[in-house]
Amino acid sequence: MGIGYGASDEQLEKQIGCVKYTLFCFNIVAWMISTALFALTVWLRAEPGFNDWLRILEAQSFYIGVYVLIGISIVMMAVSFLGCLSALMENTLALFVFVGTQVFGFIAIVAGSAVLLQFSTINSSLQPLLNVSLRGFVATSEYTYSNYVLTMIQENIGCCGATGPWDYLDLRQPLPSSCRDTVSGNAFFNGCVDELTWFFEGKTGWIVALAMTLGLLNVICAVMSFVLVQAVKKEEEQASNYRR
């Protein structure tokens, strides 16, 4: 009887050790991803040219999702240390707190990513904002500032008007040279709303992918922490029965 119990106890101890150190490694990876997410989101927020374009086009609501992801990446960097400590100490209370933070982190990451995509993809809330701003610039393209903004965007992105060259015709404005391909001389077919949206998608794609990877790690860490809690409780029960 004693031999059987000892073998079972040893097997449980090995299982706890396996889960504990696997959870520790996952937390290290989560910390690295959180750090990378923080760096990318801060870089996106601080990039001068990108920031200027959003300010000029009055589309700074794009940054709402970025702010959410900056905040959650900071929280997740700190929480990863809590996860490492709670796993190594096998403290059930700390592990339950850690599970709660992982659930919160997952929800916040999904929300932040959803908001960021809502303001950076085709058919998103960003496009009506860009359309209003760009049509306003086209309607007043005879003024120096409007002409400067349109030239900057159309030459750099390779687009024309808000939805296409017909915007200038609809608003009775001459088609500027910045709307034409320098090689063929033909007007760019695509409007700047779609081209800018594709440009923003390229900027945010990696960030959202990284954020969702972190969210997946949150789920894995939460499940493993719960498994570790149950294993530690079982070990404590076995130890209590053995003492009796």
Swiss-Prot record:
Transmembrane segments: 23-43, 62-82, 92-112, 207-227
Gene Ontology process terms (BP): establishment of endothelial barrier; glial cell migration; smooth septate junction assembly
CDD domains for this protein: tetraspanin_LEL
Membrane topology: Multi-pass membrane protein
Membrane topology, Extracellular segments: 44-61, 113-206
Subcellular location, record wording: Apicolateral cell membrane; Cell junction, Septate junction
Recorded GO CC terms: apicolateral plasma membrane; membrane; plasma membrane; smooth septate junction
UniProt entry keywords in alphabetical sequence: Cell junction, Cell membrane, Membrane, Transmembrane, Transmembrane helix
Cytoplasmic face of the membrane: 1-22, 83-91, 228-244
Subunit and partners: Forms a complex with Ssk and mesh.
UniProt similarity note: Belongs to the tetraspanin (TM4SF) family.
Function: Required for assembly of smooth septate junctions (sSJs), together with Ssk and mesh. Important for barrier function of the midgut epithelium.
Protein name: Tetraspanin-2A
Lineage: Eukaryota, Metazoa, Ecdysozoa, Arthropoda, Hexapoda
UniProt gene name: Tsp2A
